[in-house]
């Protein structure tokens, strides 16, 4: 009755979304390129839109499964091993994964290697500024790579670091001329769309970048490295009781930690948590979860080995 009376109206948001994407991207370039793209919806909300927008893509977990096959629909490498294998074993060029509500992105190169959000943010800036001639401010969360700031300096863009939580980025996107906003957990937004995270949208930008440049994802990452240098990043969550967590944070506030193993602290930033810099490109961050007995530790360095070494020294120092 409410429908017939016009009090309840059904709106096809998926159709609106796809039409918006069709006018915003060169989908012909993507769909007619020689490159083979893959998509893992993780049984989430992105499945039907991507089927429509990318009819030639290799699809995984694009059907309904209320239990998500027992795997949390979070696009991080440990949840995407099947997708990684699919890409590597079938000679696919690039794979996009999105989470349950399709706002966070995971990415794989042709070898099935996971590409983290820091690299994705840098790739997006590189494409939009160098290849498309766009400009604007870049806003990133406190846990993001220092390479973002270096990339922005290279291109003459203003960059601002904000607290963790996408609301801090969305607010800036609504009131300022922001080119891109991004956070470490895979939530990224760009101008010309909504001031909110959208994993499918970011994937389409990257697929378009590859298709129109004719370059592999690995080659495009090499272009980024030519500007900011190679780097690696990792986050490890330490599950500890709240008393221990509180004690460690008090030690951070009190300036107790001046060295972690062989890594000497040169400066500390405290925008949201504690970021201990060992040099301009190498840092460790400690931040408590606000909702659970977890201490989040993050590190960035030139190599993966060094990142894990820093995180191991951190754990040994604080616990």
Residue ranges and their predicted role:
Residues 66-73, 125-128, 169-173:
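Short, charged, surface-exposed secondary-structure boundary motifs
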Residues 42-47, 102-103, 144-146, 303:
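Gly/Ser/Thr-rich loops at beta-strand to alpha-helix junctions
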Residues 57-61, 114-119, 156-164:
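Short hydrophobic/aromatic-enriched beta-strand-loop microsegments
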Residues 48-53, 70-72, 105-110, 148-154, ...:
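Short acidic, glycine/serine/threonine-rich loops at helix termini
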Residues 94, 134-319:
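Phosphate-binding and adjacent anionic-ligand microenvironments
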Residues 1-90:
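Gly/Ser/Thr-enriched, mixed-charge loops and adjacent short helices
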Residues 21, 40, 80-84, 96, ...:
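Buried hydrophobic positions in well-ordered alpha/beta secondary-structure cores of metabolic enzymes
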């Amino acid at each position: 009755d409410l429908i017939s009376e016009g009090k309840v109206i059904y709106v096809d948001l998926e159709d609106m979304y796809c039409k918006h994407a069709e006018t915003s991207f060169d989908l012909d370039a993507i769909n007619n390129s020689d490159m083979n793209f893959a998509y893992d919806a993780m049984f989430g909300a992105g499945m039907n839109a991507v089927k429509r927008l990318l009819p030639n893509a290799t699809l995984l977990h694009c059907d309904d499964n209320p239990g998500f096959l027992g795997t949390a629909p979070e696009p991080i490498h440990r949840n995407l091993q099947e997708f990684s294998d699919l890409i590597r074993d079938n000679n696919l060029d690039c794979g996009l994964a999105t989470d349950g509500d399709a706002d966070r992105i995971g990415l794989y190169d042709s070898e099935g290697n996971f590409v983290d959000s820091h690299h994705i943010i840098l790739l997006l800036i590189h494409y939009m500024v160098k290849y498309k001639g766009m400009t604007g401010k870049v806003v990133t969360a406190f846990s993001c790579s220092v390479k973002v700031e270096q990339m922005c300096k290279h291109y003459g863009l203003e960059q601002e670091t904000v607290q963790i939580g996408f609301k801090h980025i969305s607010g800036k996107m609504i009131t300022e001329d922001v080119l891109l906003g991004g956070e470490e957990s895979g939530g990224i937004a760009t101008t010309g769309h909504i001031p909110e995270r959208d994993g499918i949208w970011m994937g389409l930008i990257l697929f378009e970048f590859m298709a129109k440049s004719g370059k592999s994802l690995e080659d495009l990452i090499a272009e980024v490295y030519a500007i900011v240098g190679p780097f690696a990043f990792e986050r490890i969550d330490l599950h500890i009781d709240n008393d221990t967590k509180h004690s460690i944070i008090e030690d951070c506030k009190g300036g107790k930690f001046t060295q972690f193993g062989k890594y000497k602290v040169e400066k500390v930033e405290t925008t949201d948590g504690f970021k201990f810099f060992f040099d301009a490109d190498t840092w460790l961050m400690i931040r408590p979860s606000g909702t659970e007995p977890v201490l989040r530790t993050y590190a960035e360095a030139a190599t993966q080995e060094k990142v894990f070494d820093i995180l191991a020294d951190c754990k040994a120092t604080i616990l």
